């Protein structure tokens, strides 16, 4: 689809900015604020753990991840194949950018959403995670702030923490052919942001606010996070943590056998 291709090009441009400015460093700091909204904590369930949950826990518990190299390759390939990858060569290197198909489906249906992204530059470099915020409406909002409310916390992201200017576009929504406006912003994911994504997945209710606050006449739009976002975040977290904890050889074998779409420069 044309629009998905345009979005992929935008996301890949973000990856290029990261590669040229950060080199091999995945630990890039970006400002964010997290406000405690409630002290209530929901009880954990006995459901089977996702790979990212295991890998975020104590070191001795990571033994639950397969020790056999070929099994590690298979698990990493499965996680990577749950994400749609886009490949582009650029001056000085190349990159793979991965986004869950759930995010692309949200876009096609005109649903404002969170867009978790994984950027891969090769087996010798740790992956980089990004968070995108995609607002789709009837008119441009000139978005400068995004708020995410979970059961326990409010996460606020201002435009000073975005790594590029807010990108604007127009798209046609299926199946009625309605024309909508789209605004997207991206930021590097810090450790706090990864914690926030886990909180979002685990929260029973998640509200999104897309706002223009840097004005005497503020404008904002509130909506519920699409349910598909939970799977999208889970897909990217699994791919990110499995890749992060894999050896260079396992990474290379997994990357050699995944599908991707080449993006024209």
Annotate each predicted stretch with a short phrase:
Residues 23-265:
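A generic "folded-domain core" signal
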């Amino acid at each position: 689809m044309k629009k998905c291709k345009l979005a992929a090009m935008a996301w890949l441009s973000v990856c290029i900015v990261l590669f040229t400015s950060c080199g091999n460093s995945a630990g890039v700091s970006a400002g964010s604020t997290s406000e405690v909204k409630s002290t209530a904590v929901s009880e954990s369930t006995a459901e089977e753990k996702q790979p990212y949950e295991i890998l975020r826990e104590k070191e001795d518990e990571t033994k639950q991840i397969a020790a056999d190299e070929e099994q590690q390759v298979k698990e990493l390939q499965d996680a990577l194949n749950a994400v749609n990858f886009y490949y582009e060569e650029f001056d000085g290197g190349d990159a793979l950018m991965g986004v869950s198909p759930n995010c692309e489906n949200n876009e096609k249906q005109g649903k404002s959403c969170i867009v978790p992204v994984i950027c891969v530059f090769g087996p010798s470099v740790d992956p980089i995670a990004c968070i995108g915020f995609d607002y789709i409406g009837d008119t441009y909002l000139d978005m400068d702030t995004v708020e995410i409310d979970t059961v326990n916390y409010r996460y606020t992201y201002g435009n000073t923490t975005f790594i590029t200017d807010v990108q604007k576009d127009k798209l046609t929504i299926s199946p009625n052919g309605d024309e909508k406006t789209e605004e997207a912003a991206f930021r590097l994911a810090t450790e706090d942001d990864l914690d926030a994504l886990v909180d979002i997945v685990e929260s029973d209710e998640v509200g999104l606010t897309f706002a223009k606050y840097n004005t005497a006449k503020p404008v904002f739009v509130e909506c519920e996070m699409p349910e598909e976002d939970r799977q999208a975040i889970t897909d990217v977290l699994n791919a990110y943590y499995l890749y992060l904890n894999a050896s260079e050889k396992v990474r290379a074998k997994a990357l050699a056998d995944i599908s991707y779409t080449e993006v024209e420069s």
